[in-house]
From Swiss-Prot:
Protein name, entry field: ATP synthase subunit b
Binding partners and assembly: F-type ATPases have 2 components, F(1) - the catalytic core - and F(0) - the membrane proton channel. F(1) has five subunits: alpha(3), beta(3), gamma(1), delta(1), epsilon(1). F(0) has three main subunits: a(1), b(2) and c(10-14). The alpha and beta chains form an alternating ring which encloses part of the gamma chain. F(1) is attached to F(0) by a central stalk formed by the gamma and epsilon chains, while a peripheral stalk is formed by the delta and b chains.
Keywords in alphabetical order: ATP synthesis, Cell inner membrane, Cell membrane, CF(0), Hydrogen ion transport, Ion transport, Membrane, Transmembrane, Transmembrane helix, Transport
Species assigned in the record: Nitratidesulfovibrio vulgaris (strain ATCC 29579 / DSM 644 / CCUG 34227 / NCIMB 8303 / VKM B-1760 / Hildenborough)
Domain of life: Bacteria
Keyword flag Transmembrane helix: yes
Subcellular location: Cell inner membrane
Gene name linked to the record: atpF
Single GO term (MF): proton-transporting ATPase activity, rotational mechanism
Main location: membrane
GO cellular component, one term: proton-transporting ATP synthase complex
Pfam families the record matches: ATP-synt_B
Function: F(1)F(0) ATP synthase produces ATP from ADP in the presence of a proton or sodium gradient. F-type ATPases consist of two structural domains, F(1) containing the extramembraneous catalytic core and F(0) containing the membrane proton channel, linked together by a central stalk and a peripheral stalk. During catalysis, ATP synthesis in the catalytic domain of F(1) is coupled via a rotary mechanism of the central stalk subunits to proton translocation.
UniProt family annotation: Belongs to the ATPase B chain family.
Alphabetized InterPro entries for the sequence: ATP_synth_b/b'su_bac/chlpt, ATP_synthase_B_chain
Length: 176
């Protein structure tokens, strides 16, 4: 409250000080001269600086807008790829399955051919073994027949008849 009354006391007093218009005019003239000198000396550079700065900002904004547009295009491309990723995955899997089925069919075909070749070879081997066994049996039977025939001839033929029979067959063999 004391401050309130003190401010009223000071406000009511006439101190006789008013604005010093001469000093103010001197300051304004001084500022105008100083601004004129600066404008005369560096006005074009200042204007060029602000104009260049303005153009630089405009160019930077245009570049940023271009980059923003390119980024949107790239984002759309990436989103499209992501959307197509599942279909691409399905296509790749289908391709690998088809290749697998082809390889499987080729392996089965090769195995069947090998099995048929092995079966055919086993049949030939069995046939050859049967023929060899039959030939061996025939040879053994021929030997046994010869032994039996010799025994029978030895019992029924005399030595003189035996000699005649040998000469007869030797003559046939030599003449033929």
């Amino acid at each position: 409250m004391t401050l309130f009354f003190a401010s009223m006391a000071y406000a009511s007093g006439d101190s006789g000080h008013g604005p010093d218009w001469g000093n103010f005019a001197f300051r304004v003239v001084n500022f105008v001269i100083f601004a004129g000198i600066i404008w005369k000396a560096a006005g074009k550079k200042i204007v060029g600086f602000f104009t260049g700065r303005r153009q630089g900002i405009e160019q930077e904004l245009n570049d940023l807008e271009t980059r923003k547009t390119e980024a949107k295009k790239q984002l759309a491309e990436v989103e499209r790829r992501i959307a197509n990723l599942e279909s691409e995955r399905q296509a790749i899997l289908a391709d690998y399955r088809a290749q697998g089925e082809n390889i499987k069919a080729a392996i089965i075909d090769k195995a069947e051919k090998s099995a048929s070749l092995i079966t055919e070879q086993a049949k030939r081997t069995a046939d050859n073994e049967i023929k060899a066994a039959i030939d061996a049996m025939r040879a053994q039977m021929a030997d046994e027949i010869i032994v039996a025939a010799e025994k029978l001839l030895a019992e029924k033929l005399t030595a003189n008849e035996h000699e005649k029979l040998i000469d007869k067959y030797l003559t046939k063999v030599v003449l033929n």
